[in-house]
Amino acid sequence: MAAVSAHMQDIKIQDQSDDDPYSPNTRDTTSPECHDDEKSEDISIRSSSFSIHNVLRRSGTTAALTMSFRRKSSWRIPNFDDRNTESVSPVVEVNEREISVDDGNSCCSDDTVLSVGNEAPVSNYEEKASQNTHQELTSFKHIQTHLSAISQLSQNMNVAQPLLLRPSPINPNPIMFLNQPLLFQSPILSQDLKGMPNRQTANVISPTFGLNFGMRLKANHETRTRSDENRYSKPEESRDYINQNCLKFSIDNILKADFGRRITDPLHKRKVKTRYEAKPAPAKDTAAFAPKLDEARVPDIKTPDKAGAIDLSKDDSGSNSGSTSGATSGDSPMVWPAWVYCTRYSDRPSSGRSPRTRRPKKPPGDTASNDEKRPRTAFSGPQLARLKHEFAENRYLTERRRQSLAAELGLAEAQIKIWFQNKRAKIKKASGQRNPLALQLMAQGLYNHSTVPLTKEEEELEMKARERERELKNRC
């Protein structure tokens, strides 16, 4: 309304001004007849039904209806890309038809003050209404862009960040709670979320973090991982600690080379000596339990000046084969790892834990029973020649080859197998080579078994070695 009143004042000023007497919008003001005509026209305008006030009222209501209808249509139709919102309601068309009636008393006639070129107020209202609708549309577009940016940000964060995160209720990020309400973020990741730029500010560096944000984030992560490593011990270290302190017979300790060695602490040795000297036991009664008892006792009651390996073959006759040869060889003898002691050599009955037992010889007058010994197999000349030829080709027979050879010679498979075993043993004995591992275990008293029977010379050598051991013990 203020614009309409200002426009009316401009019209009055134009009527009363004398600067432009020949303007087409004004009449000749010099004659008195002109003033009389203007007065009559003013009176007719005030008294007519299509007066200026009525026209302005109708135009105001039309603009208000147009604005309200456009607002409703913009809320109902969410098409923000269509900016040509020129839909006109039927009510507005009816009002415009009523206003634009072509008659002599109409406001659009040539006689009235508001001619066709003087319709500024209505156009001003329409321009304001269109501006308001455009502002509302732009505000909705801004809201839509903000929502899309937030959703894209949350999707990017979900892809870029790991899911296994420690929950931290100190500084939660509200953006992550849009799509994943159950996910908690740590403070470092929340700072990272705040520092991430949007699409609109992709080229702007955040003033809060600056260029050193990556280095600071890496330093914080390293300090946190170090504190976690110091706080929680590794399972392997704890397992080793348990094995070293509690489980003395664990697999790791058994496989070590120092497992089963004698104790080097002199105080502990003295205590163990006094404990076992107080309760001596006869050797004959405990000969059957010697393996278990000697394993637990011998490593502790060993004399401190002995620097050799452990001697586990204890008996009355002192029958051990070179048990202290490793002790006299040097200060640091070679010690085999503990898994060697768990092999088949120490599981045999004649491995040194018990004295070797031989069958007593019967007098020649007594006849041996038939169940005691199987009669010796006598091979013929062609059979022996065939067996020797086969042994020269291959010392070890397969099962199929043994079956074919037994069918060819008319012998049992067991006979052929035993003949090959005896032949290999004779060759091994004639060569004079022994297994170095067996020799080392025999020197330590852990292995006192030979696959072939001992000759008289070997027995004499063993007796001499035992006598030397006794002399050394007496000197000490």
UniProtKB/Swiss-Prot annotation:
Keyword terms, alphabetized: Developmental protein, DNA-binding, Homeobox, Nucleus
Primary localization: nucleus
Region (Disordered): 1-43, 273-331, 347-381
The keyword Transmembrane appears for this protein: no
Signal peptide limits: none
SUPFAM superfamilies: Homeodomain-like (SSF46689)
Domain of life: Eukaryota
A GO cellular-component term linked to this record: nucleus
Entry comment describing in which tissues the protein is expressed: Expressed in the middle silk gland but not in the posterior silk gland during the fourth molt/fifth intermolt period.
Pfam family, one: Engrail_1_C_sig
PROSITE patterns in the record: ENGRAILED (PS00033), HOMEOBOX_1 (PS00027), HOMEOBOX_2 (PS50071)
DNA-binding region: 372-431
A GO MF label: DNA-binding transcription factor activity, RNA polymerase II-specific
Family note: Belongs to the engrailed homeobox family.
UniProt name for this protein: Homeobox protein invected
Phylogenetic placement of the source organism: Eukaryota, Metazoa, Ecdysozoa, Arthropoda, Hexapoda
Name of encoding gene: INV
